[in-house]
């Protein structure tokens, strides 16, 4: 079943918690019926219009029945017949339309119409940089981003610190800059009343927005001459930074002139908002020169800031715009309060801790990567409609975006974007019949072309408990349960742990076989056997053990969990560990202290960290230079291949993870020690129980507790 599940994911981008659906029983009351969908995964492209059902607007797909005599098709969603259009008439069983072929359960249609405007990139640049070196980092990053923006894209630029400066990009001399106060929130109405800034798209384009190829030299000169905020920072005070006001100004400038169009705001920042609407922290340090973390639940700032940024996110979502937060800093910038700006719009969140230059520049660059066709890999202004057959009910979505106007809307989506769709069977679902789901997503490509992606899948309802259990996808369930359980904000870590334990106990009682009072008799079916292990590692992950995280770090990790495809999100729950033996063996090993052997190299992948660890013997051999000797070529090979594997993971991933090479008894070894199960092997000192004790406690609770 596992191979079949992965083949389906590769073709359709879907993972289901249950791949066989119960017609009766309580299986889905313990684990909901959910679909984890890679909404922007690549698919076969058809240069034609979709064929819609006249009754329910579903799209023709391989599951539909074709009446070749009448040249009509039966919709599996509403069960009504629709006549085939003229261009599709004459098809036969041996001459089918591409969308009817079994392998084309997911296809993308390139529509004949285009968007009026190309993609708009509006740069919102924080000039309250940390110091001269970090100001250079900002300028270098801006140059990389400008280089990768498409030539025909429209570009705008605003910089802010204490005040906001909106720059004109036209060819007129002298070129004007409009200065705005950072004290207030801006709306489209306010800008119109000011007279000079915003009246219509005809005034904005050519003035505040220009094609990149028409103003490229001007933009580069602006970046090269970009100066830090001229207002001095007093001792024991933070820079006066009006992030909220600047973002509201940018949105207000474009929301009425570019509704339902591809607009991307890129927010470059190096610190928290300390002034004006959206302030997340007081301007004065509690202690002179001290960089403290934000107080996530500070009543003076947290509530108003979240409300303000949520309002901005709703405005962007309603017109199909999105915002990326590109932060490089050593302090919290307020992501814990601003998360809706990306979460509700489909934007990307980059957090380069300690001003890590490689992570910051490479992550910002990857946002603008291109496909083999030359278009940006991200899609814009996406609207997804969910269709279900009459025996299923669509319940909603967990993940990026927002329900708006009868669809699920996201201003942008990346190849890695994953959302969770919830369904429930209706009472009239019957054994032996199929339930059908169709996901229809329209979006704009960076070349102005409009596309419609259609994914259709079907699963059988059954009364057989064994068949339902056989179709259980424990990896997808682990990711979904983590997302579902973390929707709630817990006051204490113990509260979250108790909720995880409670759900795991209920699950085990429902599906395990055991003899009352006999812990050793408990056994889960093979398809579920690894699920308790995932929950054990979930309890130990940085998603739950947030005590040593800053509020921004906790928000960042949870954002990754909600946004990444199953295989990557699973690494946040339980990392992968690859072992390279000095005799040439390469294999995946358990994330366990017993795997830390002295004669191996380990590659740990936690998604946000990639670590190459060299065992004690290997590290000693390297120090003594054995890998440079011809007779020890094998040692040189595993050193090279392990590092290449790690760097490949970093190069392919967005955001770019932190990377380090360490060895036995070095400081960075603590990263590996944090994640491995402390089973007793190796020299790991910890207060955490190991999996064996956790599993034994679970067994005892289940077999001795009759509740």
Swiss-Prot record:
CDD domains: Sec23_C. GO terms for molecular function: GTPase activator activity; zinc ion binding. It is a peripheral membrane protein. One of its GO terms (cellular component) is Golgi membrane. Keywords: Cytoplasm, Cytoplasmic vesicle, Endoplasmic reticulum, ER-Golgi transport, Golgi apparatus, Membrane, Metal-binding, Protein transport, Transport, Zinc. Its main location: cytoplasm. Signal peptide: none annotated. SUPFAM superfamilies: beta-sandwich domain of Sec23/24, C-terminal, gelsolin-like domain of Sec23/24, Helical domain of Sec23/24, vWA-like, Zn-finger domain of Sec23/24. Zn(2+) binds at residues 53, 56, 75, 78. It holds the Pfam family Sec23_helical. The keyword Transport applies. The keyword Endoplasmic reticulum applies. It is found in: Cytoplasm; Cytoplasmic vesicle, COPII-coated vesicle membrane; Endoplasmic reticulum membrane; Golgi apparatus membrane. One of its GO terms (biological process) is intracellular protein transport. Component of the coat protein complex II (COPII) which promotes the formation of transport vesicles from the endoplasmic reticulum (ER). The coat has two main functions, the physical deformation of the endoplasmic reticulum membrane into vesicles and the selection of cargo molecules. Belongs to the SEC23/SEC24 family. SEC23 subfamily. Component of the COPII coat. This is Protein transport protein SEC23. The lineage of its organism: Eukaryota, Fungi, Fungi incertae sedis, Microsporidia, Unikaryonidae. The gene is SEC23.
